[in-house]
Amino acid sequence: MTTKQIKGVLGEKLGMTQVFDESGKVVPVTVLKAGPAVVTRVRTPETDGYSAIQLGYGHINPRKVNKPLGDYLRKHNLTPRRHYVEVRTSDASEYTVGQEITADVFQPGEKVDVTGKTKGKGYAGVMKRHGFGGLGASHGTQRKHRSPGSIGGCATPGRVFKGMRMAGRMGNVRRTVQNLTVHSVDAEKGLLLVKGAVPGPNGGLVLVRTAVKGGK
C-alpha cells in the first residue's frame, strides 16, 4: 500500500504550443484540458484492502451504461461518465463521492506524470518501429535494404528467441511520461500547461498525477 499522497485528474490533450519563461527563453508546452473529473468511488483499507479514489470523466449516453454500474451511480446520485480510472493515494479518506477535481489541484512548478495512449502507426517495419539501421544501400544488397537481417542461428539454437524485435503493429499503447513540470495553470478555463510532449493525439484521454519519482 502506498504511503504517498498522490493528486490526479483526468482530461484531454489539446495540442502543443510555445511560451516564454521568466528569462525570455522559448519553452515548448502541451496544453491539457484538466477535468472536471468527479470522484465516483473511495477505496479504503478497511473495505477494499488499499487506499485509492476512482475518477470519472467525459459524457456518455446513460443507456450505454451496464446495469451494475448504473445501479451504483443512481444510488450515489452520480452522472454516468465515459472514462473511469483509479488513483492510489494515502489520503483517499479525505475525498468524498461526488467531489469535483479540476486543474487547480496542481500548482506551477510541480512535477507530474502524464499517462496517455500513443498514436497508432499501423503495421511498421523494424527501421521505423525499432530504429534499425537496415542493410547496405549497395555492394550486392538486393531488395533487402530495410530488412532486419538475421533473427537467429540455424541449428543452434534452431529457433527464434522470445522478444526478438521484428516488424509489427506500432503505437496505440499506454505510455507514461514522468517528471514533467507544470508551467502554468488556468483555473478559469480548466487548462494545464506542462513542459514537453505528452503521449497521444489531440483530443486523446490523459491522466495527470503527482510524480512518483523525486522523493518530494
Curated annotation (Swiss-Prot):
GO terms for cellular component: cytosolic large ribosomal subunit. Pfam families: Ribosomal_L3. Residues 135-156 are annotated as: Disordered. GO terms for molecular function: rRNA binding; structural constituent of ribosome. GO terms for biological process: translation. InterPro entries: Ribosomal_uL3, Ribosomal_uL3_bac/org-type, Ribosomal_uL3_CS, Transl_B-barrel_sf. Keywords: Ribonucleoprotein, Ribosomal protein, RNA-binding, rRNA-binding. PROSITE patterns: RIBOSOMAL_L3. Part of the 50S ribosomal subunit. Forms a cluster with proteins L14 and L19. One of the primary rRNA binding proteins, it binds directly near the 3'-end of the 23S rRNA, where it nucleates assembly of the 50S subunit. Belongs to the universal ribosomal protein uL3 family. This is Large ribosomal subunit protein uL3. It comes from Thermobifida fusca (strain YX).
